[in-house]
């Protein structure tokens, strides 16, 4: 797909990296299994949900191919959610978790945030909400309109994982052209100039993430879409005790926005 987009030529040509990422997204969107994973977790407690109760929710494997069916994801009183999906003092057009506002928990219920708990350093350690039992996915009440949907995993029914967030190696679009300019400006050798262009965030390892148990059956190099995050594959370093995932590409072109 990438070759089809850029065309065929016998001449040296520079193509935007975003074109390659776009082709990869298009390919993986068609064949990657969807799962929920929480990379920067904070605990979400549904205070009016019965303690000890567990429900099985259905999640679609791949909306591009309904014939691939669904899988089960457990729902319980205590969940992990993304820390970035909560804001205590949110701006007007913030549609995720904030006190007094409703959001939909994907494949589950609509909940209303009631507050949070902080530690002595002022860091949020728990988020609290109440659920509406009539809004379970598939019930008539689920049709109630809310503007935000967030993903989650059950604290008692998930796997611990390490996630390796690979990104672009270079900070510049064309390292070859930038190399000479940096060497001249800083009066340095080629190796030093190359180091100037390396993206310090080209690899970010997150050791304490959580993913739904369904991913345990995936073989090394299997592709997954972490919903709302990006496309990942199972690393060969994975073990039954702790899985390891590598990011192939995000859902959106972040670099394109930065450059604008």
Model-derived features: positions:
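Polyanion-binding catalytic cores of nucleic-acid enzymes and NTP/SAM-utilizing transferases
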Residues: 1-260
